[in-house]
From Swiss-Prot:
Residues 1-25, 80-100, 159-195, 259-270 are extracellular. This is Olfactory receptor 1A1. The chain crosses the membrane at residues 26-49, 58-79, 101-120, 140-158, 196-218, 236-258, 271-290. Disulfide bonds join 97-189. Residues 50-57, 121-139, 219-235, 291-309 are cytoplasmic. The gene is OR1A1.
Length: 309
């Protein structure tokens, strides 16, 4: 009963990105700049794909889902950080902290599995072009997206429930600008050995899509290099280049965050999370649209339609 009362009244203090006021002011301005660009950029991708019938195919269906996930992903943390900075308060309730952690794990996993589905789509398109429409049918695409969301939720729920069962004594300062599982485990005065094992299991589940992406691209490049045509190789690189760039950015920052011992985590590592939670979702629309003629044409049509109306 006492633990329930503690959970209902407990508040955490979010130390921010650096914990230094002057630097926090800089990151506030940075986030104030990044967040609207992230929302507008990803929303434009979704609207362009929905409005252009030429983009109603598996590749762009998956891209639209990725853009939606990126909108939700950045919205879980940045608005709270901006609101806290404006109000001068750094506090977040226990329930709010768990909610934030749940959606970060959920959407992070969904993002990861969506990237794997996109790699699989490219592998099928290049290595089995004659069977592409059969394999990547609308039903298959829906199953891939639904599976991504289900796995994301299934991975997030156990971690959230386990964290909710922990006791927190004394220090309640979270070494980040949002509630993440790693700093919360470090704050707990409960036995966290099982929780740490579950966290690394979760990281393993999160890493499965990376293995799928690697296998997919091995298939892509083994197919491409069998074709004695420089043009074919260049076309494959142009088709897959944007996706590979996003995968490298995303997994590079995630590995910097989680592929390390729990004892090594400190406030300095919060800077890495800025790349994952804010910068990468902002860059994705630019990466996919600037290198894609069809997407640029669809965006141009969308702008022309809005201007003429």
């Amino acid at each position: 009963m006492r633990e329930n009362n503690q959970s209902s009244t407990l508040e955490f203090i979010l130390l921010g990105v650096t914990g230094q006021q002057e630097q926090e002011d800089f990151f506030y301005i940075l986030f104030l700049f990044i967040y609207p660009i992230t929302l507008i950029g990803n929303l434009l991708i979704v609207l362009a794909i929905c409005s252009d019938v030429h983009l109603h195919n598996p590749m762009y269906f998956l891209l639209a889902n990725l853009s939606l996930v990126d909108i939700f992903f950045s919205s879980v943390t940045i608005p709270k950080m901006l609101a806290n900075h404006l109000s001068g308060s750094k506090s977040i309730s226990f329930g709010g902290c768990l909610t934030q952690m749940y959606f970060m794990i959920d959407l992070g996993n969904t993002d990861s599995y969506t990237l794997a589905a996109m790699a699989y789509d490219r592998a099928v398109a290049i290595s089995r072009p004659l069977h592409y429409t059969t394999i990547m049918s609308p039903r298959s695409c829906i199953w891939l997206i639904a599976g991504s969301w289900v796995i994301g939720n299934a991975n997030a729920l156990p971690h959230t429930l386990l964290t909710a069962s922990l006791s927190f004594c004394g220090n309640q300062e979270v070494a980040n600008f949002y509630c993440d599982i790693t700093p919360l485990l470090k704050l707990s005065c409960s036995d966290i050995h099982f929780h740490v094992k579950m966290m690394y299991l979760g990281v393993g589940i999160f890493s499965v899509p990376l293995l799928c992406i690697i296998v997919s691209y091995i298939r892509v490049f083994s197919t491409v290099f069998q074709v004695p045509s420089t043009k074919g190789v260049l076309k494959a690189f142009s088709t897959c280049g944007s996706h590979l760039t996003v995968v490298s950015l995303y997994y590079g920052t995630v590995m910097g965050m989680y592929f390390r011992p729990l004892t090594n985590y400190s406030l300095k590592d919060a800077v890495i999370t800025v790349m994952c939670t804010a910068v990468t979702p902002m860059l994705n629309p630019f990466i996919y649209s600037l290198r894609n003629r069809d997407m640029k044409a669809a965006l141009q049509k969308l702008f022309n339609k809005r201007i003429s109306s």
